[in-house]
Amino acid sequence: MLEDFDLDFQPSIDRKLLYDLASCRFVAEGRPIVFLGQPGTGKTFLATALPTAAVEAGYRGYFTSAADLVASVASAYADGNFTTRIRTYTGPSVLVIDDVGLVGFDRAQANALFQVVNRRYERGSSTIVTTNRSLSAWGELFGGDHVVAAAVLDRLLDRAVVINIKGPSWRLREHQALTEAMR
């Protein structure tokens, strides 16, 4: 899957680093990965390709959007199913949380995300996060709770590999190519 990514289109990505990550050593070491960048730059593609390689190597992986994760965990508090539900997110060797900050969180949702990230951090499990937002903006995204945002970032960034993709949108490239072909 990683071989399908056009690194020439996103030259800001370090090829050597990306192929090193595909070796799955980050999973064995419990390292988080944070993909930063504008919409359409390939964050989700890469965040899916790496755990796919990990699953092929025998690890367990799970993919979720940030919105689905916080809704699920926050509702589990209310339902009394927190312990069971959180295992969905803390059990896999690799957890991908896609689009953190695309939609802001209320305080309960911010706390739910903290619970997942903290437990994975304590277990030494790898968490992959994608975000369109700068990390400095996370305090506002977390229901204005800068302390919870700082705690999440503290755990995510400790020993993390941070990949900031600075480049154009794949989707807009495809749109432009289609538009030109139709002329």
Feature-to-residue mapping (PLM):
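A generic secondary-structure signal marking the coil-to-beta-strand transition
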Residues: M1, R31, R159-V161
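Charged, amphipathic alpha-helical linker segments immediately N-terminal to NTP-binding catalytic cores
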Residues: M1-K16
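Flexible glycine-/small-residue-rich
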Residues: F9, G37, G167
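Conserved P-loop
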Residues: I13-G91, L141
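Walker B motif beta-strand of ABC-family P-loop ATPases
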Residues: V94
